[in-house]
Design a protein with these regions (language model features):
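PP2C/PPM-type serine/threonine phosphatase catalytic domain
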Residues: 2-463
Length: 463
Protein backbone atom coordinates (compact mmCIF):
# COMPACT_ATOMS: atom_id res chain seq x y z
CA UNK A 1 0.00 0.00 0.00
CA UNK A 2 1.17 3.49 -0.67
CA UNK A 3 0.81 6.46 1.62
CA UNK A 4 -2.26 8.39 0.53
CA UNK A 5 -2.05 12.10 0.09
CA UNK A 6 -3.38 14.48 2.67
CA UNK A 7 -6.20 15.70 0.51
CA UNK A 8 -7.58 12.24 -0.25
CA UNK A 9 -7.49 11.08 3.37
CA UNK A 10 -8.85 14.18 5.09
CA UNK A 11 -11.77 13.53 7.39
CA UNK A 12 -14.60 16.01 7.44
CA UNK A 13 -16.39 17.11 10.57
CA UNK A 14 -18.98 14.96 12.29
CA UNK A 15 -21.78 17.10 10.89
CA UNK A 16 -20.90 16.42 7.27
CA UNK A 17 -20.68 12.72 8.09
CA UNK A 18 -24.15 12.71 9.61
CA UNK A 19 -25.55 14.51 6.57
CA UNK A 20 -24.28 11.67 4.42
CA UNK A 21 -26.14 9.09 6.46
CA UNK A 22 -29.41 9.82 4.69
CA UNK A 23 -27.79 8.85 1.42
CA UNK A 24 -26.40 5.58 2.77
CA UNK A 25 -28.39 2.38 2.87
CA UNK A 26 -28.39 0.27 6.02
CA UNK A 27 -26.22 -2.82 5.78
CA UNK A 28 -28.15 -5.79 4.54
CA UNK A 29 -27.31 -9.27 3.37
CA UNK A 30 -28.46 -10.46 0.00
CA UNK A 31 -29.46 -14.04 -0.56
CA UNK A 32 -27.48 -13.88 -3.77
CA UNK A 33 -23.94 -15.16 -3.05
CA UNK A 34 -22.59 -12.89 -5.77
CA UNK A 35 -23.27 -9.79 -3.67
CA UNK A 36 -19.85 -8.20 -3.84
CA UNK A 37 -18.52 -10.45 -6.56
CA UNK A 38 -16.33 -8.79 -9.19
CA UNK A 39 -17.86 -9.16 -12.61
CA UNK A 40 -14.52 -9.33 -14.35
CA UNK A 41 -10.97 -9.96 -13.32
CA UNK A 42 -8.59 -7.06 -13.69
CA UNK A 43 -4.88 -6.76 -14.13
CA UNK A 44 -3.58 -3.20 -13.96
CA UNK A 45 -0.05 -2.03 -14.45
CA UNK A 46 1.92 0.86 -13.08
CA UNK A 47 4.98 1.75 -15.14
CA UNK A 48 8.02 3.58 -13.92
CA UNK A 49 8.76 6.44 -16.27
CA UNK A 50 12.48 5.88 -15.90
CA UNK A 51 12.43 2.11 -16.43
CA UNK A 52 10.94 -0.41 -18.79
CA UNK A 53 9.88 -2.63 -15.90
CA UNK A 54 6.13 -3.09 -15.44
CA UNK A 55 4.97 -3.53 -11.88
CA UNK A 56 1.70 -5.09 -10.81
CA UNK A 57 -0.12 -2.99 -8.19
CA UNK A 58 -0.48 -6.00 -5.87
CA UNK A 59 3.25 -6.79 -5.88
CA UNK A 60 5.28 -4.85 -3.39
CA UNK A 61 8.74 -3.87 -4.58
CA UNK A 62 11.90 -4.62 -2.64
CA UNK A 63 14.68 -2.32 -3.86
CA UNK A 64 17.54 -1.12 -1.70
CA UNK A 65 16.06 2.24 -0.72
CA UNK A 66 16.76 4.79 1.96
CA UNK A 67 14.23 4.52 4.76
CA UNK A 68 11.65 7.27 4.54
CA UNK A 69 8.44 7.57 6.51
CA UNK A 70 5.26 8.81 4.91
CA UNK A 71 2.02 10.15 6.31
CA UNK A 72 -1.62 9.26 5.99
CA UNK A 73 -4.16 12.06 6.40
CA UNK A 74 -4.63 13.86 9.67
CA UNK A 75 -6.35 13.56 13.04
CA UNK A 76 -9.83 14.95 13.39
CA UNK A 77 -8.88 15.44 17.04
CA UNK A 78 -5.51 16.71 18.25
CA UNK A 79 -2.68 14.33 19.03
CA UNK A 80 -2.78 13.59 22.72
CA UNK A 81 -0.65 11.90 25.32
CA UNK A 82 -1.74 8.60 26.83
CA UNK A 83 -4.61 9.32 29.18
CA UNK A 84 -4.97 8.09 32.75
CA UNK A 85 -6.71 4.69 32.93
CA UNK A 86 -10.47 4.74 33.32
CA UNK A 87 -11.75 3.60 36.74
CA UNK A 88 -14.54 1.61 35.09
CA UNK A 89 -14.18 -1.83 33.57
CA UNK A 90 -14.17 -2.09 29.79
CA UNK A 91 -14.96 -5.26 27.88
CA UNK A 92 -14.42 -5.70 24.16
CA UNK A 93 -16.63 -7.15 21.43
CA UNK A 94 -14.47 -8.23 18.49
CA UNK A 95 -15.23 -9.58 15.02
CA UNK A 96 -13.32 -9.99 11.77
CA UNK A 97 -14.22 -10.07 8.10
CA UNK A 98 -12.04 -11.01 5.14
CA UNK A 99 -12.07 -11.77 1.44
CA UNK A 100 -9.38 -13.26 -0.75
CA UNK A 101 -8.39 -11.58 -3.97
CA UNK A 102 -10.54 -12.74 -6.88
CA UNK A 103 -13.01 -14.55 -4.61
CA UNK A 104 -16.66 -13.85 -3.91
CA UNK A 105 -17.46 -11.99 -0.73
CA UNK A 106 -20.22 -13.42 1.49
CA UNK A 107 -21.11 -10.91 4.25
CA UNK A 108 -22.23 -13.57 6.76
CA UNK A 109 -20.01 -16.47 5.76
CA UNK A 110 -16.91 -14.25 5.71
CA UNK A 111 -17.59 -12.75 9.15
CA UNK A 112 -16.07 -14.22 12.31
CA UNK A 113 -17.11 -13.32 15.87
CA UNK A 114 -14.62 -13.67 18.69
CA UNK A 115 -15.80 -15.75 21.64
CA UNK A 116 -13.45 -15.41 24.63
CA UNK A 117 -14.56 -18.85 25.82
CA UNK A 118 -12.93 -20.32 22.74
CA UNK A 119 -9.73 -18.36 23.41
CA UNK A 120 -8.64 -17.58 19.84
CA UNK A 121 -9.95 -16.62 16.41
CA UNK A 122 -8.22 -17.11 13.07
CA UNK A 123 -5.77 -19.69 14.40
CA UNK A 124 -5.30 -23.30 13.28
CA UNK A 125 -3.87 -25.74 15.81
CA UNK A 126 -3.28 -28.45 13.20
CA UNK A 127 0.40 -29.41 13.01
CA UNK A 128 0.11 -30.61 9.42
CA UNK A 129 1.04 -27.71 7.05
CA UNK A 130 -1.33 -28.97 4.36
CA UNK A 131 -4.24 -29.14 6.79
CA UNK A 132 -3.41 -25.68 8.12
CA UNK A 133 -3.59 -24.22 4.62
CA UNK A 134 -6.89 -25.96 3.97
CA UNK A 135 -8.48 -24.66 7.17
CA UNK A 136 -7.43 -21.04 6.79
CA UNK A 137 -10.15 -18.38 6.63
CA UNK A 138 -10.94 -16.87 3.25
CA UNK A 139 -8.40 -14.06 3.47
CA UNK A 140 -5.85 -14.96 0.79
CA UNK A 141 -2.38 -13.70 1.68
CA UNK A 142 -3.84 -11.58 4.51
CA UNK A 143 -4.28 -13.01 8.00
CA UNK A 144 -5.81 -11.99 11.33
CA UNK A 145 -6.01 -13.18 14.91
CA UNK A 146 -7.94 -12.38 18.08
CA UNK A 147 -7.05 -13.99 21.40
CA UNK A 148 -7.65 -13.60 25.09
CA UNK A 149 -4.49 -12.92 27.09
CA UNK A 150 -3.56 -15.73 29.46
CA UNK A 151 -5.21 -19.10 29.98
CA UNK A 152 -7.76 -20.15 32.58
CA UNK A 153 -5.16 -21.70 34.89
CA UNK A 154 -2.98 -18.61 35.04
CA UNK A 155 -2.31 -16.95 38.39
CA UNK A 156 -3.65 -13.71 36.88
CA UNK A 157 -6.76 -15.11 35.19
CA UNK A 158 -9.10 -12.77 37.09
CA UNK A 159 -7.18 -9.62 36.15
CA UNK A 160 -6.68 -10.82 32.56
CA UNK A 161 -10.29 -11.92 32.02
CA UNK A 162 -11.25 -9.07 29.66
CA UNK A 163 -7.80 -8.42 28.15
CA UNK A 164 -7.62 -9.09 24.41
CA UNK A 165 -4.84 -9.25 21.83
CA UNK A 166 -5.63 -8.81 18.14
CA UNK A 167 -3.97 -7.99 14.85
CA UNK A 168 -3.73 -8.34 11.09
CA UNK A 169 -0.85 -9.24 8.77
CA UNK A 170 -0.48 -8.78 5.02
CA UNK A 171 1.83 -11.18 3.20
CA UNK A 172 4.15 -9.45 0.71
CA UNK A 173 3.03 -10.62 -2.73
CA UNK A 174 6.42 -10.08 -4.35
CA UNK A 175 7.61 -13.39 -2.90
CA UNK A 176 5.45 -15.29 -5.38
CA UNK A 177 8.09 -14.54 -8.02
CA UNK A 178 10.47 -16.70 -5.95
CA UNK A 179 7.86 -19.49 -5.78
CA UNK A 180 7.06 -18.71 -2.16
CA UNK A 181 3.49 -18.59 -0.83
CA UNK A 182 3.24 -15.25 1.05
CA UNK A 183 0.27 -16.59 3.02
CA UNK A 184 2.52 -19.01 4.93
CA UNK A 185 4.36 -16.12 6.57
CA UNK A 186 1.35 -13.94 7.40
CA UNK A 187 -0.82 -16.78 8.73
CA UNK A 188 2.11 -18.26 10.63
CA UNK A 189 2.89 -14.89 12.21
CA UNK A 190 -0.70 -14.39 13.39
CA UNK A 191 -0.93 -17.96 14.67
CA UNK A 192 2.23 -17.65 16.74
CA UNK A 193 1.18 -14.27 18.14
CA UNK A 194 -2.14 -15.77 19.24
CA UNK A 195 -0.37 -18.69 20.90
CA UNK A 196 1.96 -16.30 22.73
CA UNK A 197 -1.02 -14.32 24.04
CA UNK A 198 -2.87 -17.46 25.12
CA UNK A 199 0.09 -18.83 27.07
CA UNK A 200 0.92 -15.53 28.79
CA UNK A 201 1.32 -16.15 32.55
CA UNK A 202 1.98 -12.60 33.75
CA UNK A 203 -0.43 -9.68 34.15
CA UNK A 204 -1.85 -8.58 30.80
CA UNK A 205 -0.45 -5.07 31.16
CA UNK A 206 3.06 -6.55 30.96
CA UNK A 207 2.39 -7.78 27.42
CA UNK A 208 3.14 -5.12 24.81
CA UNK A 209 2.18 -5.42 21.13
CA UNK A 210 5.76 -4.90 19.97
CA UNK A 211 6.81 -7.71 22.31
CA UNK A 212 4.01 -9.87 20.91
CA UNK A 213 5.14 -9.10 17.37
CA UNK A 214 8.73 -10.02 18.25
CA UNK A 215 7.65 -13.35 19.74
CA UNK A 216 5.59 -14.21 16.67
CA UNK A 217 8.43 -13.25 14.34
CA UNK A 218 10.94 -15.35 16.30
CA UNK A 219 8.69 -18.39 16.00
CA UNK A 220 8.25 -17.84 12.26
CA UNK A 221 12.01 -17.63 11.76
CA UNK A 222 12.43 -20.89 13.70
CA UNK A 223 9.65 -22.66 11.76
CA UNK A 224 11.24 -24.93 9.15
CA UNK A 225 7.99 -25.07 7.15
CA UNK A 226 8.21 -21.31 6.45
CA UNK A 227 11.32 -21.16 4.31
CA UNK A 228 10.87 -17.58 3.10
CA UNK A 229 8.40 -14.71 2.93
CA UNK A 230 7.49 -11.35 4.33
CA UNK A 231 4.60 -9.47 5.89
CA UNK A 232 3.41 -6.18 7.30
CA UNK A 233 1.56 -6.22 10.63
CA UNK A 234 -0.72 -4.15 12.84
CA UNK A 235 -1.10 -5.51 16.38
CA UNK A 236 -2.99 -4.33 19.47
CA UNK A 237 -3.35 -5.21 23.15
CA UNK A 238 -6.52 -4.03 24.92
CA UNK A 239 -6.70 -3.94 28.73
CA UNK A 240 -9.80 -4.04 30.97
CA UNK A 241 -9.35 -0.38 31.99
CA UNK A 242 -9.73 0.83 28.39
CA UNK A 243 -6.06 1.30 27.61
CA UNK A 244 -5.11 0.02 24.17
CA UNK A 245 -1.57 -0.08 22.84
CA UNK A 246 -1.08 -0.43 19.09
CA UNK A 247 2.05 -1.37 17.15
CA UNK A 248 2.10 -0.84 13.39
CA UNK A 249 4.75 -2.02 10.95
CA UNK A 250 4.15 -1.22 7.29
CA UNK A 251 0.99 -0.08 5.56
CA UNK A 252 -1.65 -2.00 7.47
CA UNK A 253 -3.28 0.36 9.91
CA UNK A 254 -5.87 1.37 12.49
CA UNK A 255 -8.66 3.94 12.76
CA UNK A 256 -10.49 4.79 16.00
CA UNK A 257 -13.98 6.25 15.58
CA UNK A 258 -15.66 7.92 18.54
CA UNK A 259 -19.23 9.18 18.20
CA UNK A 260 -19.08 10.19 14.53
CA UNK A 261 -15.51 11.51 14.53
CA UNK A 262 -12.10 10.03 13.80
CA UNK A 263 -10.25 10.13 17.11
CA UNK A 264 -7.06 8.38 15.97
CA UNK A 265 -5.50 6.92 12.84
CA UNK A 266 -2.19 5.18 12.24
CA UNK A 267 0.62 6.46 10.06
CA UNK A 268 1.90 3.99 7.42
CA UNK A 269 5.59 3.20 7.24
CA UNK A 270 7.00 2.96 3.73
CA UNK A 271 10.39 2.99 2.04
CA UNK A 272 8.81 4.37 -1.12
CA UNK A 273 5.77 4.04 -3.34
CA UNK A 274 4.13 0.62 -2.81
CA UNK A 275 7.11 -0.49 -0.69
CA UNK A 276 6.09 -0.78 2.97
CA UNK A 277 8.14 -1.77 5.97
CA UNK A 278 8.02 -5.55 6.24
CA UNK A 279 9.21 -8.44 8.37
CA UNK A 280 11.11 -10.97 6.28
CA UNK A 281 12.60 -14.45 6.29
CA UNK A 282 15.34 -14.63 3.64
CA UNK A 283 16.99 -17.99 2.86
CA UNK A 284 20.82 -18.10 3.01
CA UNK A 285 21.00 -19.01 -0.68
CA UNK A 286 19.13 -15.87 -1.69
CA UNK A 287 21.35 -13.76 0.56
CA UNK A 288 24.42 -15.24 -1.11
CA UNK A 289 23.05 -14.51 -4.57
CA UNK A 290 22.32 -10.92 -3.58
CA UNK A 291 25.85 -10.43 -2.27
CA UNK A 292 27.32 -11.77 -5.54
CA UNK A 293 25.13 -9.86 -7.96
CA UNK A 294 24.65 -6.77 -5.82
CA UNK A 295 21.58 -5.34 -4.17
CA UNK A 296 19.92 -6.17 -0.89
CA UNK A 297 16.59 -7.31 0.47
CA UNK A 298 14.33 -5.14 2.55
CA UNK A 299 14.55 -6.27 6.15
CA UNK A 300 12.66 -4.50 8.89
CA UNK A 301 12.19 -5.80 12.40
CA UNK A 302 9.56 -5.62 15.16
CA UNK A 303 11.62 -2.93 16.89
CA UNK A 304 10.92 -0.66 13.88
CA UNK A 305 7.16 -0.70 14.50
CA UNK A 306 5.56 2.57 15.55
CA UNK A 307 3.69 2.40 18.87
CA UNK A 308 0.59 4.40 19.80
CA UNK A 309 -1.46 4.42 23.03
CA UNK A 310 -5.16 5.25 23.04
CA UNK A 311 -7.86 5.21 25.72
CA UNK A 312 -11.04 3.56 24.47
CA UNK A 313 -14.37 4.70 25.87
CA UNK A 314 -17.87 3.26 25.94
CA UNK A 315 -19.16 2.96 22.37
CA UNK A 316 -15.81 3.50 20.62
CA UNK A 317 -15.12 1.53 17.44
CA UNK A 318 -11.55 0.53 16.53
CA UNK A 319 -10.86 -0.70 12.99
CA UNK A 320 -7.69 -2.68 12.26
CA UNK A 321 -7.21 -3.48 8.57
CA UNK A 322 -4.72 -4.40 5.87
CA UNK A 323 -3.86 -2.27 2.86
CA UNK A 324 -6.61 -3.95 0.84
CA UNK A 325 -8.91 -1.56 2.72
CA UNK A 326 -6.76 1.59 2.85
CA UNK A 327 -5.77 1.31 -0.83
CA UNK A 328 -9.42 1.49 -1.88
CA UNK A 329 -11.27 3.60 0.70
CA UNK A 330 -10.03 6.48 2.82
CA UNK A 331 -10.68 7.64 6.38
CA UNK A 332 -13.69 9.70 5.30
CA UNK A 333 -15.29 6.64 3.71
CA UNK A 334 -14.65 4.56 6.84
CA UNK A 335 -16.05 7.30 9.07
CA UNK A 336 -19.27 7.54 7.06
CA UNK A 337 -19.70 3.76 6.95
CA UNK A 338 -19.22 3.30 10.70
CA UNK A 339 -21.34 6.34 11.62
CA UNK A 340 -24.24 5.37 9.37
CA UNK A 341 -24.34 1.77 10.59
CA UNK A 342 -24.00 2.69 14.26
CA UNK A 343 -26.87 5.18 14.06
CA UNK A 344 -29.14 3.10 11.84
CA UNK A 345 -28.76 0.03 14.05
CA UNK A 346 -29.45 2.13 17.15
CA UNK A 347 -25.98 1.76 18.68
CA UNK A 348 -25.51 5.53 18.51
CA UNK A 349 -28.26 8.13 18.70
CA UNK A 350 -28.21 11.63 17.24
CA UNK A 351 -29.43 14.23 19.75
CA UNK A 352 -29.45 18.02 19.96
CA UNK A 353 -26.30 17.85 22.07
CA UNK A 354 -24.49 15.55 19.64
CA UNK A 355 -24.08 11.85 18.98
CA UNK A 356 -24.57 9.70 22.09
CA UNK A 357 -24.09 6.00 22.82
CA UNK A 358 -27.36 4.06 22.93
CA UNK A 359 -28.62 1.98 25.84
CA UNK A 360 -28.95 -0.98 23.47
CA UNK A 361 -25.23 -1.27 22.71
CA UNK A 362 -24.61 -4.37 24.83
CA UNK A 363 -27.61 -6.21 23.37
CA UNK A 364 -26.59 -5.36 19.81
CA UNK A 365 -23.13 -6.85 20.33
CA UNK A 366 -24.49 -10.11 21.82
CA UNK A 367 -24.81 -13.24 19.61
CA UNK A 368 -27.66 -12.67 17.17
CA UNK A 369 -28.03 -9.07 18.36
CA UNK A 370 -28.83 -7.75 14.87
CA UNK A 371 -30.52 -10.81 13.42
CA UNK A 372 -33.91 -9.09 13.31
CA UNK A 373 -32.58 -6.34 11.06
CA UNK A 374 -31.41 -8.65 8.27
CA UNK A 375 -33.80 -9.84 5.54
CA UNK A 376 -34.09 -13.39 4.27
CA UNK A 377 -34.54 -14.34 0.63
CA UNK A 378 -38.29 -13.93 1.08
CA UNK A 379 -37.82 -10.41 2.41
CA UNK A 380 -39.02 -11.19 5.95
CA UNK A 381 -36.69 -10.60 8.89
CA UNK A 382 -34.91 -13.59 10.38
CA UNK A 383 -36.53 -14.89 13.59
CA UNK A 384 -35.01 -13.85 16.89
CA UNK A 385 -32.82 -16.42 18.58
CA UNK A 386 -34.48 -18.48 21.31
CA UNK A 387 -32.53 -17.98 24.52
CA UNK A 388 -33.26 -21.59 25.54
CA UNK A 389 -31.69 -22.99 22.38
CA UNK A 390 -28.13 -24.08 23.14
CA UNK A 391 -27.23 -25.05 19.58
CA UNK A 392 -25.25 -22.33 17.74
CA UNK A 393 -26.94 -21.06 14.60
CA UNK A 394 -25.62 -19.10 11.60
CA UNK A 395 -27.71 -16.10 12.58
CA UNK A 396 -25.81 -15.93 15.88
CA UNK A 397 -22.92 -14.55 13.84
CA UNK A 398 -24.98 -11.44 13.05
CA UNK A 399 -23.71 -9.02 15.68
CA UNK A 400 -23.03 -5.31 15.55
CA UNK A 401 -19.27 -5.86 15.37
CA UNK A 402 -19.55 -8.45 12.59
CA UNK A 403 -21.85 -6.15 10.60
CA UNK A 404 -19.35 -3.29 10.90
CA UNK A 405 -16.45 -5.53 9.86
CA UNK A 406 -18.38 -6.94 6.89
CA UNK A 407 -19.54 -3.45 5.89
CA UNK A 408 -15.99 -2.06 5.72
CA UNK A 409 -14.69 -5.18 3.96
CA UNK A 410 -17.59 -5.19 1.50
CA UNK A 411 -17.16 -1.51 0.63
CA UNK A 412 -13.43 -2.02 0.06
CA UNK A 413 -14.21 -5.07 -2.08
CA UNK A 414 -16.61 -3.14 -4.30
CA UNK A 415 -14.22 -0.19 -4.61
CA UNK A 416 -11.36 -2.51 -5.57
CA UNK A 417 -13.14 -3.66 -8.74
CA UNK A 418 -14.66 -0.29 -9.67
CA UNK A 419 -12.96 1.16 -12.77
CA UNK A 420 -14.65 4.54 -12.38
CA UNK A 421 -13.79 5.21 -8.74
CA UNK A 422 -10.22 6.30 -8.10
CA UNK A 423 -9.15 5.00 -4.71
CA UNK A 424 -6.21 6.22 -2.60
CA UNK A 425 -3.83 3.89 -4.46
CA UNK A 426 -4.84 5.26 -7.85
CA UNK A 427 -4.53 8.86 -6.69
CA UNK A 428 -1.11 8.22 -5.22
CA UNK A 429 0.04 6.43 -8.38
CA UNK A 430 -1.10 9.42 -10.44
CA UNK A 431 0.85 11.73 -8.13
CA UNK A 432 4.05 9.68 -8.30
CA UNK A 433 3.78 8.86 -12.01
CA UNK A 434 1.69 11.52 -13.76
CA UNK A 435 2.61 10.11 -17.17
CA UNK A 436 0.84 6.83 -16.45
CA UNK A 437 -2.90 6.47 -16.60
CA UNK A 438 -3.84 4.34 -13.59
CA UNK A 439 -7.54 4.52 -12.76
CA UNK A 440 -9.97 2.73 -10.48
CA UNK A 441 -9.45 0.52 -7.46
CA UNK A 442 -6.72 -1.93 -6.58
CA UNK A 443 -7.68 -5.61 -6.49
CA UNK A 444 -6.17 -7.11 -3.34
CA UNK A 445 -6.83 -9.36 -0.37
CA UNK A 446 -8.91 -7.68 2.32
CA UNK A 447 -8.92 -8.24 6.08
CA UNK A 448 -10.71 -6.20 8.78
CA UNK A 449 -10.90 -6.57 12.57
CA UNK A 450 -13.43 -4.44 14.47
CA UNK A 451 -13.26 -3.85 18.24
CA UNK A 452 -16.17 -2.23 20.12
CA UNK A 453 -15.63 -1.02 23.70
CA UNK A 454 -18.37 -1.60 26.29
CA UNK A 455 -18.24 0.01 29.73
CA UNK A 456 -19.65 -2.72 31.96
CA UNK A 457 -20.69 -0.20 34.61
CA UNK A 458 -22.70 1.92 32.19
CA UNK A 459 -24.17 -1.13 30.45
CA UNK A 460 -25.28 -2.63 33.78
CA UNK A 461 -27.04 0.58 34.82
CA UNK A 462 -28.94 0.68 31.53
CA UNK A 463 -30.25 -2.89 31.69
Amino acid sequence: MMPPSVSCRACSSACSSLQAIARDCVYSVSANPNTYSPSVSRTANVRFSFQTVRIRPNTRISPNLTRQSSRRAFHSTPTFSFERPSPSKISYRVAASSSGKGRRFHPIKNAYNFDPEVDALGVSKDKNPISRRRNRPDSGEDAFFVSRIGNRISDHQDNNAEAVAFGVADGVGGWTESRVDPADFSHGLCGYMAQTAQTWHEPAEHLRPKQLLQAGYDHVVADSTIRAGGSTASVGVALPDGRVELANLGDSGTVLVRRAAVHHYSVPQTHGFNTPYQLSVIPPRMRAQASVFGGAFLEDFPRDASVTNVQMQHGDVLIVATDGVFDNINNQDILKLITSRMIMTGAWTATDSGVMVSKNLRALTAPGGLVGALPTSSGAPLPQRDSTDSEPKPEDQVTLQSVLAATVAGEAKMASVDYRRDGPFAKEAQRYYPGDYYRGGKVDDICVVVVIAIDDGIAADQV
